[in-house]
A protein has these predicted regions:
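A general beta-strand register signal
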Residues: 45, 85-86, 206, 265, ...
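RNA pseudouridine synthases
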Residues: 1-187, 191, 295-304
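Short, surface-exposed secondary-structure edge patches
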Residues: 52-56, 229, 268
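Short, surface-exposed loop/helix-turn segments at secondary-structure junctions
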Residues: 203, 253-265
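Conserved hydrophobic positions within beta-strands
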Residues: 84, 177, 215-218, 251
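Conserved "cap/hinge" positions at secondary-structure junctions
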Residues: 48, 67, 242, 260-261
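The conserved catalytic core of RNA pseudouridine synthases
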Residues: 130-162, 170, 174, 189-247, ...
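Short alpha-helix capping/helix-loop boundary micro-motifs
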Residues: 47-53, 224-227, 262
Length: 310
């Protein structure tokens, strides 16, 4: 097995942040002690140079993290059907179903989007993020449905990654949340960082968190719930889930950030990535792609419209 390589681009708002602190926020599956060892061993470079843990970012650097590969099962192509929205020589956009993990990780080495892409695209996937994440430039949570883009070559990958870094990509999500809204629209501007009590969770962190902005618009109000559209200005891990919970509107079905009771039996959060738009890396044209609400989501909305209030 080869080493796992991950590439990150520091954002302007990261200026002045120590590299070890930055990485502890970005690498959710890597402990602080391992980050320190990676730095000490020269496995983390900033613009091609090894740095110490006290290095402070300028906010524009390319950061490469090389993690020596643990003994894990070989990642193999799998003939898993994909709901392809669009495909060309540079990108492929798919409508990801609920329950499917985007890339292999501990406990999920088969049945992922990556396994399916490796079969469908063969060797035509970008290699920037290493053997565990070929083609993957962004991701959505396992129980979030909807549109994601994968890249077939490194040029396209770098281009899309740069657009993500400057927040120029259009990303609209749809979700059902607890409680009715009084306002028709609004913005949550609250920094997000790792939950100090559980690194697998995120939390609003006004002292050490990274800038996170979510714009929301109420589409329908029901008795105890609301159907809303959320547009991401930034793209932090679990951003919509954390932001909605922070203002008293946790997402229905979210078993991590929602503590409100519901009679609906759901597999995770009722959250759908409905719209993704970006400048095409080869043509320079803006393209926008949509994924329809999944069947379970439509049935839930129908029940709420008929007066359901579980």
């Amino acid at each position: 097995m080869s080493d796992s390589v991950q590439n990150l681009i520091a954002e302007p708002e990261d200026k002045g942040t120590r590299i070890d602190k930055y990485l502890s926020q970005e690498l959710e599956d890597v402990s602080r002690s391992r980050i320190q060892k990676l730095l000490d061993d020269g496995n983390i470079t900033v613009d091609g140079r090894c740095v110490k843990s006290n290095y402070k970012l300028n906010g524009t650097e390319h950061i490469t993290i090389t993690i020596p590969e643990l003994i894990v099962p070989e990642i193999l192509p799998e003939n898993i059907p994909l709901n392809i929205i669009y495909e060309d020589d540079d990108v492929i956009l798919i409508d990801k179903p609920k329950g499917m993990v985007v890339h292999p990780a501990a406990g999920h080495y088969t049945g992922t989007v990556v396994n399916a892409l490796m079969y469908h695209c063969r060797d035509n996937l970008s290699g920037i993020n290493g053997v565990m994440r070929p083609g993957i430039v962004h991701r959505i949570d396992m129980n979030t449905t909807g549109v994601i883009v994968a890249c077939k070559n490194d040029k396209a990958h770098n281009d899309i990654a740069a657009q993500l870094a400057v927040h120029s990509i259009t990303r609209k999500y749809y979700c059902i949340v607890h409680n009715r809204f009084k306002e028709e629209e609004g913005t949550v501007d609250a920094p997000i960082g790792r939950n100090p009590k559980d690194r697998k969770m995120m939390a609003v962190d006004r002292k050490n968190g990274k800038r996170a902005v979510t714009h929301y618009r109420v589409l329908e109000n029901f008795d105890k719930y609301s159907f809303i559209e959320c547009q991401l200005e930034t793209g932090r891990t679990h951003q919509i889930r954390v932001h909605m919970a922070s203002i008293g509107h946790p997402i229905l079905g979210d078993d991590v950030y929602c503590h409100a009771r519901s009679g609906y039996k759901l597999q995770g959060q009722t959250l759908h990535a409905g719209v993704l738009g970006f400048i095409h890396p080869s043509t320079g044209e803006y393209m926008e792609f949509k994924a329809p609400l999944p069947e379970y989501f439509e049935k839930l909305l129908k029940d709420l419209r008929n007066g359901g209030s579980n």
